[in-house]
Amino acid sequence: MGLETEKADAQIYMDEDSYSRHSGLGYPEPEKCAKSTQDRDPRGLNTHLKMGFEDVIGEPESTHSFDKVWICSHALFEVSKYLIYKVLTVLLAIPLAFVAGILFATLSCLHIWIVVPFVKTCLMVLPSVQTVWHSITDGFIAPLYKSMGLIFSSISLRLSPE
């Protein structure tokens, strides 16, 4: 309760023999499986998710919990984050990848076969519309605003002191 003077570091050690970086499945030929050092986020799309215990929980100097509580909570945080992520990816990764593939395929198809031809058609028709628009503005709108400008330009304001 604040009497500890040394900072306790909590770390989890796992032997490489009993720990597999894969999903726990044994691979007969390690050359054919993905390397554990492979960068799965080469463009840094999810760098904001690199969050540790210290980024979420912090105790100021004046209020410290017991060292054992701090160590156990740190270990529980890391283990639960790891295990729940693994369980959720087992349950959701393949279906969501399938849905995302369908979504991106649909959007690509719509963009290629509908959006781009529509935009090209509009750009092809716009010079004709531009000519008609200039004729309308030069024939009707420009004279109207020119007349209004002449009317309002003849108004003068004089202020006299009282």
Swiss-Prot record:
Residues annotated with Phosphotyrosine modification: 19, 27
Disulfide bonds: none
A Pfam family per the record: Caveolin
UniProt keyword annotations, A-Z: Cell membrane, Cytoplasm, Golgi apparatus, Membrane, Nucleus, Phosphoprotein
Phosphoserine PTM positions: 20, 23, 36
A GO biological-process term: caveola assembly
Topological domain spans for side Cytoplasmic: 1-86, 108-162
MF terms in GO: D1 dopamine receptor binding; molecular adaptor activity; protein kinase binding
Subcellular compartments: Nucleus; Cytoplasm; Golgi apparatus membrane; Cell membrane
Regions that enter the bilayer but do not cross it: 87-107
Annotated region (Disordered), positions in chain: 19-40
Post-translational modification: Phosphorylated on serine and tyrosine residues. CAV1 promotes phosphorylation on Ser-23 which then targets the complex to the plasma membrane, lipid rafts and caveolae. Phosphorylation on Ser-36 appears to modulate mitosis in endothelial cells. Phosphorylation on both Tyr-19 and Tyr-27 is required for insulin-induced 'Ser-727' phosphorylation of STAT3 and its activation. Phosphorylation on Tyr-19 is required for insulin-induced phosphorylation of MAPK1 and DNA binding of STAT3. Tyrosine phosphorylation is induced by both EGF and insulin (By. similarity).
Membrane topology type: Peripheral membrane protein
Compositional bias of kind Basic and acidic residues: 29-40
GO cellular component: caveola; cytoplasmic vesicle; focal adhesion; Golgi membrane; nucleus; perinuclear region of cytoplasm; plasma membrane raft; sarcolemma
Protein family per UniProt: Belongs to the caveolin family.
Summary of the function given for this chain in its UniProt record: May act as a scaffolding protein within caveolar membranes. Interacts directly with G-protein alpha subunits and can functionally regulate their activity. Acts as an accessory protein in conjunction with CAV1 in targeting to lipid rafts and driving caveolae formation. The Ser-36 phosphorylated form has a role in modulating mitosis in endothelial cells. Positive regulator of cellular mitogenesis of the MAPK signaling pathway. Required for the insulin-stimulated nuclear translocation and activation of MAPK1 and STAT3, and the subsequent regulation of cell cycle progression.
Subunit structure of this chain's protein: Monomer or homodimer. Interacts with CAV1; the interaction forms a stable heterooligomeric complex that is required for targeting to lipid rafts and for caveolae formation. Tyrosine phosphorylated forms do not form heterooligomers with the Tyr-19-phosphorylated form existing as a monomer or dimer, and the Tyr-27-form as a monomer only. Interacts (tyrosine phosphorylated form) with the SH2 domain-containing proteins, RASA1, NCK1 and SRC. Interacts (tyrosine phosphorylated form) with INSR, the interaction (Tyr-27-phosphorylated form) is increased on insulin stimulation.
Designated name of the protein: Caveolin-2
Record organism: Didelphis virginiana
Name of the gene: CAV2
